Regions:
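Extracellular, surface-exposed passenger/stalk and repeat segments of large secreted bacterial proteins
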Residues: 16, 80, 144, 158, ...
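Extended hydrophobic-aromatic, low-complexity segments
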Residues: 127, 207-209, 255
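Extracellular interaction modules
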Residues: 19-23, 83-86, 277-286, 381-385, ...
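Extracellular repeat-rich scaffold modules on cell surfaces
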Residues: 1-14, 20-22, 26-78, 86-148, ...
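Extracellular beta-strand/loop-rich repeat segments of large surface/secreted proteins
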Residues: 44, 108, 154-241, 471, ...
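Residue-level signature of catalytic and energy-coupling elements of molecular machines
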Residues: 151
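Extracellular/surface-exposed low-complexity segments
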Residues: 201, 218-341
Length: 779
């Protein structure tokens, strides 16, 4: 019993083997193992330079002072319940929770293989050494303010900032920062084969560790709770997080040799990896999410691969960083087998590539949508598209595209596809202009064009084209559209020749033709045609133009039959007819017609030809009335008149006229028929003068003469003549009238001889004979 003053024990046996009740001061100036239990209200002082071990279950309350040597506590009760003033060395060789407050200038050593928790608000200034077991600090001041030398295991596990001078983790040691804890140190040293473990949660602030003077890194970094500080569902590479683990005021020396990461959301896309690295300033060690594409190069925790698997059909991810070849940095032991140069898009979601990428190994789209926002986005390799490739860009895209998938052109720019493509899933143009520079550019599938499709190429384009958009033919080549097309936005021909091999080839919209439109087909083409270009009809089919057309470049008929159902059908330019032009319409057709072909007038309407025509293939009138307003109107060929030919003109009409139809002379001009004509339908003279220069000029039918018929010929004219008009015999030849004529307008003989072989031959009117009248008849 110590009731007053100080009792000094100079050896561990000095107090015998019984319990000690210390109500004053017990000074232990000795070394060894003191196993006596100490109770009471007094204090214990360790003096001298020896090492003393207290192993009793002590309950004294007056505190402990270590003024010299080493005091070893081999259980957490060994120092009673009072504060500890440590000005030498306190060694805690025990497990459990030690909550006595420790102050003083001395050092604390944790020894043994047990786990010890320091929970006190400690102020000691000496170093802390962990030589064995695990030391857990559950108060931010538990380790005092001195340097820490960790040779075993240290856990800082309190919400808030631990402040120490130096923290060194020796080889084989592990320093762990608990979730919510941070550390402020003068220096941080992680030696080779050491481990730094950082546990993160949503309350963890960065940086987790700040060192004001120096950071030296080696060994292993283990990180948990990553998902609490990094976004596991980023929308783009711009959203990939950076969280600072270690910050230094000076350049960090060394680096961790190994990194392990745990606690990331299981839904984190496998194309994103978590990586730890020293930043470009060299002063921060950061935890980042990055593309797995670069994992091996950056020593990330996963093996690098080039697969982007977006499983959510409504989800998307935008890559704004450049994807380049990384084959030289790949781990040869990687299980992925990736070549480091190719990209694979999987899953139902959308991957957006925004950078000008340089990878060379090709792109495979096996699911969802891959969006390229520039023409370099898919690198330089071929594209295998088995889902959807969306090109939201302008420029020239020359990568070859194959596969069963679709290509979509979006955005308002002009994009040219120049590759020899074989994809079969079709093409959708939703905006802007898509230019095909060869007929294979759009693969083999149908095209849905809701904007502008420009075909700057020659050859045969047999893809079916639908949609509400416009098709443009540009360039100097000849392009054939052979598909059964339904697009409604119209067609523009700005260069070369566009050949339509069926009447649906140009869809249902208007055609603006500023070059050459060739229609190599039969059927009814009712699209309206405008522009300065030429229309050509080729092929042996019969084609009908039924639109109200305004094109000015002329029409060429090379083969077959071209039917015009209106006088506007052939625009306003000249017609070169080298086959058959059928005019099944009425009205005034003023276009000039040339060529070696034939003109046919069909239908029951009245059509006027007023052009100065030179066609040589003849004219067929199968229905209605064909009016010629000049003697060149029917070209130079024969006329087969099976309906009505009206000649409303003057001059010399030398074309031969045959057929079963009628010829009408109208107008007040003088017209001469000089052909050897065989038409049988009769002749009507309603105005002016009709001159016949041979007895066959008026065919074989009756003549209804209500104006003037001039017969300037010789021979036997046996056509019956009726009407109110006059008959004039001119010329010096002898003409015989042998018909039974009833005309009433009289007869004028101005030259030659007129022979009447019957008393009706000269009709009923007066005869003015200024030459010779021979009456070779009786009656």
């Amino acid at each position: 019993l110590i009731s007053d003053g100080t009792l000094v024990a100079s050896n561990v046996e000095a107090l015998g083997s019984g319990d000690v009740t210390d109500n004053a001061t017990l000074e232990m100036n000795t070394g060894g193992d003191f196993a006596n239990n100490i109770g009471g209200t007094g204090s214990v002082v360790k003096s001298g330079d020896k090492t003393l071990t207290l192993s009793g279950a002590n309950s004294y309350t007056g505190g402990t002072t270590i003024s010299g040597g080493t005091l070893v506590a081999n259980n957490v009760e060994a120092l009673g319940t009072g504060d500890v003033t440590n000005n030498a060395t306190l060694e805690l060789n025990t497990g459990g929770t030690f909550d006595n407050a420790i102050s003083g200038s001395g050092q604390v050593v944790k020894s043994g293989d047990e786990t010890l928790t320091l929970s006190g608000n400690n102020t000691y200034r000496g170093a802390t050494t962990i030589s064995g077991g695990t030391l857990i600090a559950t108060h931010v001041n538990a380790l005092g303010t001195g340097a820490i030398d960790n040779r075993a295991s240290l856990l800082l596990d309190a919400s808030g900032q631990f402040t120490v001078t130096d923290l060194t983790t020796e080889s084989g040691g592990n320093t762990e920062i608990g979730a919510g804890s941070t550390l402020q140190a003068t220096t941080l040293t992680q030696k080779s084969d050491s481990t730094l473990t950082i546990n993160l949660d949503s309350n963890t602030a960065d940086p987790v560790i700040h060192a004001a003077s120096q950071v030296s890194l080696a060994g292993t970094l283990d990180i948990t709770g990553v998902g609490d500080v990094l976004d596991s569902d980023p929308a783009s590479t711009d959203d990939l997080d950076t969280f600072t683990l270690i910050a230094s005021d000076k350049t960090i020396a060394g680096d961790f040799e190994k990194l392990t990461v745990a606690g990331m959301d299981a839904d984190l896309a496998d194309f994103i990896t978590v990586d730890g690295r020293i930043d470009d300033t060299g002063k921060q060690y950061e935890l980042t999410t990055a593309l797995t594409w670069y994992a091996d190069r950056d020593d990330a925790v996963t093996d690098a691969h080039g697969t982007f698997n977006l499983t959510n059909a409504d989800g998307s991810f935008a890559v704004n960083t450049v994807l380049e070849n990384v084959d030289a940095t790949l781990d040869p032991a990687s299980a992925t087998g990736w070549d480091g140069t190719s990209l694979i898009k999987q899953g139902a979601g959308t991957l957006i590539l925004n950078a000008e990428n340089t990878y060379t190994g090709g792109t495979t789209i096996s699911g969802g949508t891959l969006v390229a926002t520039n023409v370099e986005a898919l690198g330089s390799g071929d594209v295998t598209d088995d889902a959807t490739l969306e090109l939201n860009t302008g420029g020239t895209f020359d990568n070859a595209i194959s596969g069963s998938g679709q290509v979509v052109k979006s955005g308002d720019k002009m994009l040219t596809l120049s590759g020899a493509n074989s994809y079969s899933g079709g093409t959708l143009i939703s905006d802007g202009t898509l230019v095909a520079s060869n007929v294979e550019s759009l693969g083999t599938g149908d095209v849905t064009n809701n904007a502008t499709l420009e075909l700057n190429t020659g050859g045969t384009f047999d893809n079916a084209i639908g949609g509400s958009g416009n098709v443009v033919k540009s360039g100097a080549d000849t392009l054939t559209l052979s598909g059964s097309n339904s697009y409604t936005g119209g067609t523009t021909i700005s260069g070369g020749t566009l050949v339509a091999s069926n009447v649906e080839a140009l869809g249902t919209g208007d055609v603006t033709n500023n070059a050459v439109l060739e229609l190599n087909t039969g059927g009814d083409f009712d699209n309206a045609i405008s522009g300065s270009g030429q229309v050509e009809k080729s092929g042996d089919g019969t084609l009908t133009l039924s639109g109200s057309n305004t094109y000015t470049g002329g029409t060429t008929i090379n083969d077959g039959t071209l039917i015009a159902t209106s006088v506007e059908a052939l625009g306003t330019g000249d017609v070169t007819d080298n086959a058959t032009l059928a005019l099944n319409t009425g009205g005034d057709f003023i276009n000039n017609i040339g060529g070696t072909g034939r003109v046919e007038k069909s239908g029951d309407e009245t059509l006027t030809l007023s052009g100065s025509n030179t066609y040589t293939g003849g004219t067929l009138i199968s229905g209605g009335t064909l009016v010629a307003t000049n003697v060149e109107a029917l070209g130079t060929g024969d006329v087969t008149d099976n309906a009505v030919l009206e000649l409303n003109t003057g001059g010399d009409f030398i074309n031969n006229i045959g057929g079963t139809g009628r010829v009408e002379k109208s107008g007040d001009d003088t017209l001469t028929l000089s052909g050897t004509n065989s038409y049988t339908g009769g002749t009507t003279i309603s105005g002016g003068t009709l001159v016949a220069t041979n007895v066959d000029a008026l065919g074989t039918g009756d003549v209804t003469n209500n104006a003037t018929l001039e017969l300037n010929t010789g021979g036997d004219f046996d056509n019956a003549i009726s009407g109110s008009g006059q008959v004039v015999k001119s010329g010096d030849e002898t003409l015989t009238l042998s018909g039974s004529n009833t005309y009433t307008g009289g007869t004028l003989i101005s030259g030659g001889t007129l022979v009447a072989t019957n008393v009706e031959a000269l009709g009923t009117g007066d005869v003015t004979d200024n030459a010779t009248l021979a009456l070779n008849t009786g009656g």
